[in-house]
């Protein structure tokens, strides 16, 4: 295979979409597998919608996922001279023409076609006119003179051969009246200039492919290999939208997913390697190929994503987990060294009940002794309806324990339960709510051992 060069070319008009992140991942893996280059291009020709915040989100999202790009980032907004040069060459060679038709006139043609129930293809009266007929008071656009006869064949690695009749392709605008290039021309000029050998993108771009190939052919450029992958759908099979959940990579990061986990999950959305589910980035680079791509849309499955993330959480060492958990807690709390120590001691018990870093941080609040305890609604109701005298007995009983470890605490609870002819769970329910602020938590006995007598009694006495 020739030196492989792939590209990821997002438009900076919002967050880094989860589907776009998968496209970037596939391009990255294919380039790395073939010892090639993975390039990044920002398609910011839409000045009104493109923002610096969106560009920053793309950069930070890719870096967080570990998808490092080669060479400097290409910004289309800085390359209009390249596009203009290509358009003027086509004009000189008779493969493009100046068009003076207004948008109002085009819209009239469109409406007429609709009224006659005909497929609309714009036919410009300026296609074959001589320069002496050009008006002097109107700024023209430059349109491609698409061949009227013949057909364009898209040789797609995944979709197979897709044939489009030239008669179904309009004379697309290459250069607007203000001298700026359209998306279609910019993409082709950039891909050629950057030496792109393989285009891997969503199949929503398949309709663009034929039009872009028409420009490639007019310019005499070699058409890169094309692979159009099915989009990601929601769990209900519909096209992914906001109602299906978080869409941006930054949102998944904020929800407590690990980048290794998200990459693994996205990789398996539309690509497979036998029955392997857990695939490291090293393995992905070694195994990735276009032959193993699926032809059907993949469905976003949060349960599977959570399960995979839980696996990757358990692969981290205690110090790393503690550091990541504390980092999240510091967004809302001032954390002392003592509290960090408590969280570190408790990490194995917290991990059992967690699928994300956010889950860990939520449970770790139990150990923030220097901050007021936060009670969830269920815990509040349990405390409100509990036997206050029973809690007083528990407080007095725990205060008498000399060696305050989980075995001693558990034995004391059993003793109090027996004395009151109660089940152990009858006591533990309100005690858990008071100590943790939750109706479900890791073992209260283990929590008591870590926090110590003084902190436990302080929480029980708040009733």
Curated annotation (Swiss-Prot):
Name of a matching Pfam family: tRNA-synt_1c
Binding, ATP:
242
Q: Which Gene3D superfamilies does this one have?
A: 1.10.10.350, HUPs
Which top-level group of life is the source organism from? Bacteria
Q: Name one GO molecular function term.
A: ATP binding
Find motif ('KMSKS' region) and give its ranges.
239-243
Key words, A-Z:
Aminoacyl-tRNA synthetase, ATP-binding, Cytoplasm, Ligase, Nucleotide-binding, Protein biosynthesis
GO annotation terms (biological process): glutamyl-tRNA aminoacylation
What are the GO cellular component annotations? cytosol
Catalysis performed (reactions) = tRNA(Glu) + L-glutamate + ATP = L-glutamyl-tRNA(Glu) + AMP + diphosphate
What is its subcellular localisation? Cytoplasm
InterPro entries, alphabetized: aa-tRNA-synth_I_cd-bd, aa-tRNA-synth_I_codon-bd_sub2, aa_tRNA-synth_I_cd-bd_sf, Glu-tRNA-ligase_bac/mito, Glu/Gln-tRNA-synth, Glu/Gln-tRNA-synth_Ib_cat-dom, GluQ/Sye, GluRS_core
| Disulfides per UniProt | none
Ion transport: present as a keyword of the record?
no
* EC number annotated for this UniProt entry: 6.1.1.17
Quaternary structure and interacting proteins, as annotated: Monomer.
* Function noted in UniProt: Catalyzes the attachment of glutamate to tRNA(Glu) in a two-step reaction: glutamate is first activated by ATP to form Glu-AMP and then transferred to the acceptor end of tRNA(Glu).
The record's section on NCBIfam families has: gltX_bact
What name does this protein carry? Glutamate--tRNA ligase 2
Q: Which organism is it from?
A: Rickettsia akari (strain Hartford)
Supply the gene name.
gltX2
